[in-house]
């Protein structure tokens, strides 16, 4: 039976030390089939998922996708616009989907949410429970994601890029999609988040050289 996957995402690396807010005009917005048309063949994580889904003969149900360059805290209008569109579309399709696949950054901060992705995943979890629907929720994240317990507790799997610069972002999405495929076969998957005690300086996290090259 063909799997139907609801595909959406919001991607922003927020720099809270910047005073200027990031507004709706700063975001590139794709809705419905535009997500597939604008991303197919462009080498993005979304493109990676589209390719994997095609090979698996999955049906992609596109929702909303938003992305902006790294910048300041995201304003409330963006929150409202994204939430409204995402949950309206999810509500319309939720009875006929087998999974949710999300393209996220993992370090987005908005006016009302210090952990935007964690709060967003929690809202999805509550939505599905209220509908008495149980489907996997899988997300691909940026290497620089601030992975929170809330993200882990409210998702089936989050999988981050491994390289900096992010030359593997497309491959990471394919890997996340392959994990979703495995989950369809064996849904009893436990997700574990191992935290580090260290804060790594940006100058030391390039994965082409040591120490990160040896670690990874």
PLM region spans:
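N-terminal amphipathic/basic leader segments beginning at the initiator methionine
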Residues: 2-55, 206-207
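Active-site histidine-anchored catalytic micro-motif
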Residues: 6, 11-13, 27-28, 74-80, ...
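Accessory alpha-helical/coil subdomains and C-terminal extensions
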Residues: 45, 52, 185-216
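Short, charged beta->alpha transition segments
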Residues: 46-49, 83-96
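Glycine/alanine-rich phosphate-binding loops at beta-alpha junctions
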Residues: 54-58, 74
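Short beta-strand elements in bilobed, periplasmic/extracellular small-molecule ligand-binding domains
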Residues: 57-65
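Charged, often glycine-rich, active-site loop that binds/positions anionic groups
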Residues: 65-83
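Active-site-proximal beta-alpha loop/turn segments in soluble metabolic enzymes
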Residues: 68-73, 105-110, 165, 196-205
């Amino acid at each position: 039976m063909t799997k139907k996957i609801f595909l959406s995402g919001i991607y922003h690396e927020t720099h809270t030390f910047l005073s200027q807010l990031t507004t709706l005009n700063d975001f590139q917005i794709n809705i419905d089939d535009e997500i597939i048309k604008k991303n197919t063949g462009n080498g993005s994580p979304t493109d990676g998922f589209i390719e994997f889904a095609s090979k698996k003969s999955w049906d992609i149900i596109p929702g909303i996708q938003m992305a902006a360059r790294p910048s300041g805290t995201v304003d409330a209008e963006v929150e409202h616009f994204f939430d409204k569109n995402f949950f309206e579309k999810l509500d319309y399709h939720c009875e006929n989907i087998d999974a949710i696949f999300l393209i996220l950054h993992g370090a987005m901060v908005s006016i009302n949410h210090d952990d935007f992705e964690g709060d967003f995943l929690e809202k999805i979890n509550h939505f599905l429970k209220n509908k008495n629907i149980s489907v996997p929720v899988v997300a691909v994240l940026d290497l620089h994601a601030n992975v929170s317990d809330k993200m882990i507790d409210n998702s089936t799997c989050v999988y981050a890029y491994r390289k900096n610069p992010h030359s593997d972002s497309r491959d990471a999405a394919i890997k996340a999609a392959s994990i979703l495929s495995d989950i369809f076969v064996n849904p009893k998957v436990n997700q574990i988040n191992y935290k580090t005690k260290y804060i790594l300086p940006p100058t030391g996290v390039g994965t082409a050289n040591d120490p990160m090259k040896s670690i990874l």
